[in-house]
A protein has these predicted regions:
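Extracellular/lumenal inter-transmembrane loop segments of multi-pass membrane transporters
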Residues: 41-54, 79, 102-113, 146, ...
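Extracytoplasmic
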Residues: 30-42, 280-287
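Cytosolic juxtamembrane N-terminal segment immediately preceding the first transmembrane helix
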Residues: 1-26
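Loop-to-transmembrane helix entry/capping segments in MFS-fold secondary transporters
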Residues: 51-52, 116, 134-135, 141-157, ...
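Membrane-interfacial loop- and helix-cap regions that link adjacent transmembrane helices
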Residues: 16, 94, 102-121, 204, ...
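Helix-to-loop junctions at the C-terminal end of transmembrane segments
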Residues: 64-87, 92, 310-327
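Intracellular juxtamembrane helix-capping segments at the cytosolic ends
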Residues: 122-143, 148-149, 366-381
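Glycine-rich segments within core transmembrane alpha-helices of 12-TM secondary carriers
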Residues: 57-69, 125, 129, 144-198, ...
Length: 417
């Protein structure tokens, strides 16, 4: 299959499977650094026992992510998507490298100064996340649903991979001197390398794939100005002024109109993540009591969440199991709030088996609902509108995360902090 541009150039419509692999890797890179920081929470709890690092680092991360995505979503129609995404991945790489430099410079010591430095890096991760997650979801929303599903699966895979690596490094270094620190440094070294790989993938490989050029050319023909630089990187030159002035192009819906037409999706995404982040990772890391797994317990819970979140993001690929009814999506989203009393009473009275099961349900439902909503919402819109809607939904997602992280502190009531 091919697509003919206005200037007569033909763009081939092929390479879908390879593009899905690249989307998966780019999704992985979007959260790999942040998940690495979360997954070595036992190292930071050891270094900064008085500062609740799991909760504080997440709370620092979110305002930067939410503030950045709000600005970027408002200006998305005029932002160069290529520069935006490359800026995000480069910032992930530099921030991951900064954590290694900070730890080496301080010889692995704790203290308030070092903790402030780690918090600054956490804020940088938030800014990078807003650039990449909003930019990529918006960009992939104007392509086929399989691409956005692969990207979202990559987001979850980063959590599963970092959890698996953390369990391996904990086992490998558990009995060695300075084992926690060695495991953490290995994590950030891998993270830095992977983020650099994502920079190269997005800069040199992704824009040159035929099917990606096809969808971006189609979006440009519908009036999208955000794809021009990526098309140029793929060898296709288009006039941005022509797209802006062409009277034949139908007017796109405003961001406000798009938001109101999809307000149920926006609320669903917000509620999904306010619930998830009010439990994960803070509650699972600090408030689940002592059990036979000892120091492995929190790591196992986080790993189970990440694995089932990943599985949940692949279930919608089976068409019969994909939830498309907007009312049903809202009902299922609201029903997840029953998990709050379930977690509370299980932490107080239940054993670790029940807690692992609840954590798995939390992850499975989070991944499944996220993919169902973000793949269904862009259907029926033109390219520029799909890009805008993708950014708006990511803004709601990050708003939900920020609210959930804030509410997570309520679990500390009555614990003397």
């Amino acid at each position: 299959m091919s697509y003919q541009l206005d200037n007569g150039e033909v763009v081939r419509h092929e390479g879908k499977f390879f593009a899905m692999i690249v989307c998966w890797l780019l999704g992985n890179g979007c959260l790999f650094s942040w998940n690495s920081m979360l997954t070595i929470e036992d190292y930071y709890v050891y270094l900064f026992p008085k500062y609740h690092p799991t909760r504080v680092l997440t709370l620092v991360y979110q305002p930067f992510a939410l503030g950045s995505i709000a600005i970027l979503a408002y200006r998305e129609a005029k932002i160069n998507t290529r520069v935006r995404n490359l800026t995000g991945y480069t910032l992930f790489f530099l921030a991951s490298l900064a954590l290694i430099i900070l730890d080496v410079a301080t010889s692995g010591r704790g203290g308030i100064g070092v903790f402030v430095g780690v918090c600054i890096v956490s804020g940088a991760f938030g800014v990078a996340d807003a650039h990449v997650q909003g930019g990529m979801v918006g960009d992939l929303s104007l392509m086929c649903p399989e691409f956005i599903q692969s990207f979202l699966a990559g987001l979850a895979a980063s959590g599963a991979l970092t959890s698996a690596l953390r369990l391996i490094t904990k086992a490998a270094f558990e009995n060695s001197q300075d084992g926690l620190r060695k495991g953490a440094m290995m994590f950030f070294s891998i993270s830095s390398f992977f983020e650099l790989l994502c920079v190269l993938l997005y800069a040199l490989i992704f824009p040159k794939l035929p099917i990606v050029k096809y969808y971006r050319s189609k979006a440009a023909s519908e009036g999208s100005m955000t794809v021009a630089a990526d098309l140029a990187a793929g060898g296709i030159q288009r006039s941005q002024d022509g797209a802006e002035e062409d009277p034949k192009l139908p007017e796109r819906l405003t961001n406000k109109q798009l938001f109101l037409e999809n307000i149920d999706y926006a609320i669903d995404v917000f509620l999904i993540y306010i619930l998830t982040l009010s439990i994960f990772p803070g509650f699972l890391s600090e408030d689940t009591g002592s059990h036979s797994l000892g120091s492995w317990y929190a790591l196992v819970l986080i790993a189970m969440y990440n694995v089932w979140d990943l599985i949940g993001r692949y279930i919608p690929l089976i068409e019969r199991l994909k939830l498309t009814s907007r009312k049903c999506l809202t009902v299922v989203t609201l029903s997840r709030f029953l998990l709050i009393p379930a977690f509370y009473f299980t932490a107080k009275y239940g054993d670790q088996g029940w807690m692992i099961m609840l954590t798995s349900i939390l992850g499975l439902s989070n991944g499944y609902l996220t993919v169902c909503i973000l793949t269904a919402a862009p259907k029926g819109y033109k390219g520029p509108e799909q890009n805008a809607l993708g950014n708006l939904l990511v803004m709601c997602l990050l708003a939900g995360i920020f609210s959930g992280v804030t509410l997570d502190w309520l679990w500390l009531i009555g614990k003397g902090w």
